[in-house]
Amino acid sequence: LAEKTMDDLRELGKALRWHPAFPKGANVNFCDIAASDRIVELTYERGVEDFTYACGTGTGSTVLALTLMGKVSGEDVAVAVPGGELRVTIDRDNGSIRNIWLTGPTNIVCEGEVRDEDLHI
């Protein structure tokens, strides 16, 4: 992340988000590994079409992938995101992933209403 500008990352995020391999689109997570228990992460989120403060599923998936690759410990990994710091622990049992624990602050960033007729169900 330190070697790329935000504009470069935004363009790459947009290109990957719309890549034909992902017909419904995808969130794109970028990360730098600072230590075995600390990473820095940015999420380019579909629908928002820009970076967001945080993405819990993206953060959990990123730490899980890095843990399985042996890049981070998977135990109380601190993840610095634009919205603050999240912590992730990968719970394993005999080589199987049992749980992904995500903790961190929460904030209401908007409120809205969805009418029944807008749901199309």
Regions found by a protein language model. Name each.
Residues 57-58:
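An anionic, turn-rich surface loop/hairpin at beta-sheet edges
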Residues 1-54, 63-121:
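Active-site proximal loop and beta-alpha junction motif in alpha/beta enzyme cores
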